[in-house]
């Protein structure tokens, strides 16, 4: 009886083993069939893709051949005038004194957009260029003005819906606690969509000494938007050149998304005098002949002192001169020796005593920030 049971167990064990072997063999064959089918399907997919590529290439050749060599899409001048690009570039020339390299770079970008539009009119291929930019330079060198004009150009050429400018800093983008940064960053992006987002002093978004800094979350959101929405949003990163270079070294993904780097040089004293004259003209004032050398000497000295900010410093000086002119005229008109009358010329002229002199500037020292 024992022998019978032993033989029966052995029989069942062998049978189970054989069944397992059979199942493994069948599974192996099935896996091989699946793998072979995948290889066949992949080969077929590649073959179909190659055929589609060939057909697309042939269609492109046929399309190009169908366009006469002497076909005209219009003149560059016509498009510059019709779309208002020429007017914007002329306004940029009038708004900004000097900055020849900056204006040349803006013209290059405008030229690319105009030529792309000419190509599109003929049915030629066009690809949306990377229009994200980096503006480097000291404060008051015209970065915000250029960003505003670029938005207008992009809108006129059909690359942005509205072309408006939104200026933001770290405080506008980065939150103070967990879960606060993403909504803030997305809200700013939402406001800028269809136009230009200028992030001033962008390097403050990244804190190398704190890997838990909330700025990293804002950067990741910006990177995604710059890639996915580049047809409807242009991001301009601005700041000092050395700090921006360091920022890009920490965030290589940001550097690869920025296709246009424009450096804004500091103004010379002569250019700052011209800027002051333009500001006065726009405000319907003018400097007297005696006032010009006073301001020129002032600005030369001011350039060597702390907190100098190029055109911003000039604007502060002009605003200060207007206040001093106002109190001068007020005192003259209310003095006992005056009939109280003030002429148009007096109301429009800034005299030398209205501007801060070099002597006053030196006496103030570091308090010159007050202008």
From Swiss-Prot:
Transmembrane segments: none annotated. It is found in: Plastid, Chloroplast. Residues 1-54 form a transit peptide. GO terms for molecular function: ATP binding; ATP hydrolysis activity. ATP binds at residues 137-144. InterPro entries: AAA+_ATPase, AAA_lid_6, ATPase_AAA_core, CbxX/CfqX_mono, CbxX/CfxQ, CbxX/CfxQ_RuBisCO_ESX, P-loop_NTPase. The keyword Transferase does not apply. Keywords: ATP-binding, Chloroplast, Nucleotide-binding, Plastid, Transit peptide. One of its GO terms (cellular component) is chloroplast. Belongs to the CbxX/CfxQ family. PANTHER family: AAA-TYPE ATPASE FAMILY PROTEIN / ANKYRIN REPEAT FAMILY PROTEIN, AAA-TYPE ATPASE FAMILY PROTEIN _ ANKYRIN REPEAT FAMILY PROTEIN. Seems to be necessary for the expression of RuBisCO. This is Protein cbbX homolog, chloroplastic. It comes from Guillardia theta (Cryptophyte).
